[in-house]
């Protein structure tokens, strides 16, 4: 395995610290917009960084920094099955769910992991065909019309983001065969809201838990079982699919469910949308064709991320820019704004992807580090956010870099002309206007009306939000997060930070440790049972 160094030990990072940001007011030109543009996957999904505060000097140092840190070589180690997740002694194999780029990866000296993931996909595709044809019906003999996925974190956020991104596209192309719903929160009101809004007789339920013992998912699964029984469905297991590890409690102890699809512990939840975790529901709702297009887009972007030239590798360049903005310019957050209603859930997935991966304060050697790591990821959809938090982005005291995402065409192809332009033209005009306004600003002697500009942004754009495009965009961000982790010398593939709260919650629920006056006082105020 290659050597890792802390970010502040890398010679080219020390050089980068002395480089001032580019002045966007004067730098942003038509020529720059044309030149500072690369494709994420090949030729249809673009990453434009013309409105980032960088120039050729930065790009040269980025290249040297990437080479010094062996970023592409480390990516190749991931693809070849090295145990990059050192704290858990695991490989990191989410790229294999959409195609093989590196060497054969053999687990436990016997199982080819690409073949394992492919066989699970084929099982999913065949199962979906049986559901769609009506060969498999509900326990009461009805054809399934709905799918509800029950899971939390990566078992919900990524799949939900992809589902909402593709739903209208599938509808327009007659590929929307079932309705999808999600239950994640342990709040029983969410379960009741979803289950009371559908006919459970016509609904297939997907239970996703890697360990088979996730607190929230177990509780929501029991809520579901109770609801099915109340609706006279005695053979409820015939309407439930399990997605879990082969050796989990759900797989070993819980028998008789309609079908089982298996995850692998080499893929963390936030990197699992292109595994059974995401593709089961997506195939059921939108067909095998859509699922394969998502995988194709992701795989093509994975390949492009192997390019050593930072000017031809969007995910690598985005990671280097992110490090510069966070660790040199001290920008503490990043805002994701998609000018597409279909992508309203996407920033929530990216929030988990980046903050759970790189929200660490120790390096790969379990040593405390003394530089900044992940930025706060947040966002929304345009143009809605222009009327909420854009005031702060334009004139607030914090500079917040932004990622804009936009598409030339709509998914449903319905529009209206108002004031001599279509709604979609207005949407795109607002996207372009915001990038320019944030970059160039506008001087005014009235300070209240002055726009300083110099607010950096990147633009991801394509002709249309298709399954292929969303697959490529998903891969772009996954690989960006991976490269950032390499530079920061942290393990992007564990999540110890989620454990402590779980332990204390279990203590409270079991009435343990009530010699702790803090637990007891909070519990008496909030939990009626105490």
Swiss-Prot record:
> Which residues act catalytically here?
356 (proton donor), 387, 502
Q: Which Gene3D superfamilies match?
A: 1.10.1390.10, Glucose-6-phosphate isomerase like protein, domain 1 (3.40.50.10490)
Biological process, per Gene Ontology: gluconeogenesis; glucose 6-phosphate metabolic process; glycolytic process
Question: What cellular component terms from Gene Ontology apply here?
Answer: cytosol
- According to its UniProt record, in which pathway does this protein act? Carbohydrate biosynthesis; gluconeogenesis; Carbohydrate degradation; glycolysis; D-glyceraldehyde 3-phosphate and glycerone phosphate from D-glucose: step 2/4
EC number(s) given by UniProt: 5.3.1.9
Briefly, what is this protein's role? Catalyzes the reversible isomerization of glucose-6-phosphate to fructose-6-phosphate.
Q: Which PANTHER family does this chain map to? A: GLUCOSE-6-PHOSPHATE ISOMERASE (PTHR11469:SF1)
Supply the name of the protein.
Glucose-6-phosphate isomerase
Q: Which organism is it from?
A: Borreliella burgdorferi (strain ATCC 35210 / DSM 4680 / CIP 102532 / B31)
Its organism's taxonomic lineage begins at: Bacteria, Pseudomonadati, Spirochaetota, Spirochaetia, Spirochaetales
Annotated gene: pgi
């Amino acid at each position: 395995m290659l050597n890792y160094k802390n970010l502040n030990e890398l010679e080219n990072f020390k050089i980068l610290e002395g480089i001032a940001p580019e002045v966007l007011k004067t730098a942003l030109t038509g020529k720059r917009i044309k030149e500072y543009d690369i494709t994420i996957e090949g030729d249809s999904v673009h990453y434009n960084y013309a409105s980032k505060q960088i120039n050729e000097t930065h790009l040269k140092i980025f290249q040297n920094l990437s080479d010094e840190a062996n970023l592409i070589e480390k990516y190749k180690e991931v693809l070849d099955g090295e145990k990059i997740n050192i704290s858990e002694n695991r490989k990191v194999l989410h790229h294999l769910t959409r195609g093989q780029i590196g060497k054969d990866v053999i687990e436990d000296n016997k199982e080819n992991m690409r073949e394992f993931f492919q066989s699970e996909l084929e099982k999913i595709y065949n199962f979906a065909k049986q559901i769609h044809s009506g060969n498999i019906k509900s326990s009461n003999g009805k054809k399934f019309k709905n799918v509800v996925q029950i899971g939390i974190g990566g078992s919900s956020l990524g799949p939900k983001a992809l589902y909402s991104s593709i739903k209208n596209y599938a509808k327009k192309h007659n590929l929307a065969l079932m309705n999808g719903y999600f239950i994640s929160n342990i709040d029983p009101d969410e379960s009741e809201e979803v289950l009371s809004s559908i006919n459970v007789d016509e609904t297939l339920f997907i239970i996703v838990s890697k360990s088979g013992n996730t607190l929230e998912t177990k509780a929501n699964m029991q809520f579901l079982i109770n609801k099915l029984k109340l609706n006279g469905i005695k053979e409820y297991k015939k309407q439930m699919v399990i997605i879990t590890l082969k050796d989990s409690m759900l797989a070993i102890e819980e028998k008789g469910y309609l079908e089982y699809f298996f995850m692998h512990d080499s893929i963390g939840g936030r990197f699992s949308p292109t595994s059974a975790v995401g593709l089961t529901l997506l195939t059921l709702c939108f067909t095998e064709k859509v699922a394969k297009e998502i995988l194709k887009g992701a795989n093509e972007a994975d390949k492009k991320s192997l390019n050593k030239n930072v000017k031809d590798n969007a995910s690598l360049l985005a990671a280097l820019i992110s490090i510069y903005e966070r660790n040199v310019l001290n920008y503490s957050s990043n805002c994701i704004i998609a000018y597409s209603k279909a992508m309203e859930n996407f920033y929530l997935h990216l929030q988990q992807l980046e903050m759970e991966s790189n929200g660490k304060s120790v390096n790969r050697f379990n040593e405390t580090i003394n530089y900044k790591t992940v930025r706060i990821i947040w966002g929304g959809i345009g143009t809605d956010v222009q009327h909420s938090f854009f005031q702060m982005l334009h004139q607030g005291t914090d500079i917040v870099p932004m990622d804009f995402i936009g598409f030339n065409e709509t998914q449903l192809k319905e529009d209206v002309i108002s004031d001599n332009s279509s709604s979609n033209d207005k949407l795109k005009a607002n996207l372009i206007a915001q990038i320019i306004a944030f970059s160039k600003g506008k001087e005014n002697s009235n300070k209240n009306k002055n726009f300083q500009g110099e607010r950096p942004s990147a633009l991801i754009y394509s002709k249309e939000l298709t399954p292929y495009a969303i697959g490529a965009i998903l891969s772009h961000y996954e690989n960006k997060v991976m490269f950032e982790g390499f530079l920061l010398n942290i393990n992007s593939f564990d999540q110890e930070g989620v454990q402590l709260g779980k332990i204390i919650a279990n203590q409270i629920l079991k009435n343990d440790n009530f010699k702790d006056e803090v637990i007891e006082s909070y519990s008496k105020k909030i939990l009626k049972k105490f």
